[in-house]
Design a protein with these regions (language model features):
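Glycine-rich, basic loop-to-helix element that forms the pyrophosphate-binding segment
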Residues: 65-84
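Membrane-interface aromatic/basic loop that binds lipid-linked glycans or pyrophosphate carriers
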Residues: 1, 263-324
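Conserved nucleotide-sugar donor-binding catalytic segment
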Residues: 9, 143-228
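Short, well-formed alpha-helical segments that are part of the catalytic scaffolds
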Residues: 15-28
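The conserved acidic donor/metal-binding loop of glycosyltransferases
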Residues: 93-97, 122
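Short aromatic/hydrophobic "clamp" motif used to bind/position activated sugar donors
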Residues: 89
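Acidic donor-binding segment of Leloir-type glycosyltransferases
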Residues: 27-66
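Conserved donor NDP-sugar-binding/catalytic core segment of glycosyltransferases
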Residues: 101-135
């Protein structure tokens, strides 16, 4: 039986372009007690030669016989973490990078807050040319569930599966990463399910998130993709609202923050998810989706947009959908 260690970096791999840089950033950690589990998702690119160029006992390499991520990205994530043996998991990406101090600083916080399930660093975001487009602002080291949701609702902090450290036991207890269509909102939903004891942030910029134009969740521009993402949007809105409505305020500050979250949540969804997706979708795709009266688990496209208070698309409805 393999010995349990403290941390597992799990790297589902498909693209070769930044793959070596991603591996190097993990192996260059100043904290040494970790393994790197690489899962080749039946990539058509030559990942084998890149992995085989490393002589490092911390690497364990697996290959899927068939591609999983193209059909269900979250299923591939959950399949990949099954190979890990660490007490804490980091689901890495094949095009993002970690600072050498990432794990050392995360470990200090893990030891300081043993009851917490989710840890995150401050994040820098770059475009495909490597240019910095955003650096997150400072946050308190520890945030309660409602404090984090308030910060997230105001877009002060973002989400992204690769930069979190997850407590393995807690993650498996909720069935792994949240399964949403095209992994749309899967990162947010997973954190939401795990953060009852709060969330911890390191205010050092320890992770570089590459805003790739090649990911599954960003490249698809079709009616099916738009419908799937709108379905995921409704799923997340329902889950978020249910959790917020069930939350019992602990003090007057919680009461205020909850009221503000309820007020500004639709704006955040509209700005951060719906609008961004509509921006990359062609007008023909949008009109086709509307014209076919696409249903999302029995809920129309316009119901989702209405929940997000998206007036432009509500106006467009009258132009392209005949009255019945």
């Amino acid at each position: 039986m393999l010995e349990t260690i403290k941390y597992s970096f799990v790297l589902p791999a498909y693209k070769a372009k930044y793959f070596r840089e991603a591996i190097d950033s993990i192996l260059n950690q100043t904290y040494a007690d970790f393994e790197l589990v690489i899962v080749n998702d039946a990539s058509p690119e030559d990942l084998d030669s890149i992995v085989n160029s490393y002589d490092d006992k911390r690497i364990r390499y697996y290959k899927n016989e068939q591609n999983r991520g193209g059909k269900d990205l979250v299923a591939q994530w959950n399949h990949s973490i099954a190979y890990a043996r660490g007490e804490y998991l980091i689901l890495a990406s094949d095009d993002d990078e970690y600072s050498p101090l990432y794990l050392e600083r995360m470990d200090a916080l893990v030891d300081k807050y043993p009851h917490v399930n989710v840890f995150r660093p401050r994040v820098k975001r770059i475009n495909h040319k490597g240019k910095i487009v955003r650096i997150e602002g400072y946050q308190p080291e520890y945030l309660t569930k409602v404090e984090y949701l308030y910060a997230w609702t105001n877009l002060w902090i973002g989400s992204g599966i690769p930069f979190y450290v997850f407590k393995r036991e807690a993650l498996l207890a909720i069935g792994g990463f949240a399964s949403y269509p095209l992994a749309w909102f899967s990162d947010d939903a997973t954190v939401l399910r795990l953060m009852e004891p709060g969330i911890v942030t390191c205010n050092m910029t320890l992770f570089t998130f590459r805003l790739s134009t090649e990911s599954i969740s960003t490249t698809q521009n079709s009616k099916a993709s738009l419908s799937a993402k709108l379905k995921a949007t409704k799923m997340f809105c329902d889950e978020h609202n249910r959790i917020i409505n069930d939350y019992i305020p602990q003090n007057e500050e919680d009461v205020l923050l909850l009221s503000l979250i309820k007020k500004f949540f639709p704006r955040m969804i509209r700005k951060n998810k719906v609008r961004s997706q509509l921006k990359i979708s062609s007008l023909a795709t949008i009109i086709s989706t509307i014209g076919d009266s696409v249903k999302i688990d029995g809920v129309s496209l316009f119901y989702v947009l209405k929940c997000c208070k998206y007036p432009i698309l509500n106006s467009l409805k009258s132009l392209v959908v005949p009255k019945r």
